[in-house]
Amino acid sequence: MAIILGIDPGSRITGYGVIQRAGRQQQYLGSGCIRMQGDALAPRLQQIFDGVSQLILQYKPDMFAIEQVFMAKNPDSALKLGQARGAAIVAASNQGLDVAEYSARQIKQSVVGNGNAQKSQVQHMVTFILKLPGTPQADAADALAVALCHSHTNENLIKMSGQVKKTVRGRLR
């Protein structure tokens, strides 16, 4: 059993999603948004760090995954997003968690089966996979998708490592 915390970073709103994986089953544990107050960047980064640190203490995840920075049209937005990611990553690292990073395309491919999926398709699949009673907010759904992507990727890595261990003289055993 593993608890996975997924993060969809943002300098104004950071989404989080927590799932538990037991075998091939994924169970929803929680999701929501950390909403930053104020206009100054430094206090907002502190709020992200504090919020993610609190989530780690609350849910005690075994794994931490975060979405990578995408290329924004506005360079200033990309820099702020990178700093928001940094605050979340340091919070995870500070608690001894390894950090896995996935591109938006990888996340969409893993959850929807299409790397060019629309946000509404991601929300629908997250709701379906986790059997949620309603559709989560966009940022929370994205964070749950990050956690699901890590769950799927980690499961495949475990399967592959199991196959490697079973290979003897070029044959699967």
Curated annotation (Swiss-Prot):
InterPro entries (UniProt xref): RNaseH-like_sf, RNaseH_sf, X-over_junc_endoDNase_Mg_BS, X-over_junc_endoDNase_RuvC
Binding-site positions, Mg(2+) 1: D8, D139
GO terms assigned for molecular function: crossover junction DNA endonuclease activity; DNA binding; magnesium ion binding
Main location: cytoplasm
Classification via CDD domains: RuvC (cd16962)
Superkingdom assignment: Bacteria
Reactions the enzyme catalyzes: Endonucleolytic cleavage at a junction such as a reciprocal single-stranded crossover between two homologous DNA duplexes (Holliday junction)
BP-aspect Gene Ontology terms: DNA recombination; DNA repair
Enzyme class: hydrolase
Active site, per annotation: D8, E67, D139
Gene3D superfamilies per UniProt: Ribonuclease H-like superfamily/Ribonuclease H
Pfam family for this entry, one: RuvC
Keywords: Cytoplasm, DNA damage, DNA recombination, DNA repair, DNA-binding, Endonuclease, Hydrolase, Magnesium, Metal-binding, Nuclease
Family named by the database record: Belongs to the RuvC family.
Oligomer status and interactors: Homodimer which binds Holliday junction (HJ) DNA. The HJ becomes 2-fold symmetrical on binding to RuvC with unstacked arms; it has a different conformation from HJ DNA in complex with RuvA. In the full resolvosome a probable DNA-RuvA(4)-RuvB(12)-RuvC(2) complex forms which resolves the HJ.
Name listed for the protein in its UniProt record: Crossover junction endodeoxyribonuclease RuvC
Classification of source organism: Bacteria, Pseudomonadati, Pseudomonadota, Gammaproteobacteria, Alteromonadales
Gene: ruvC
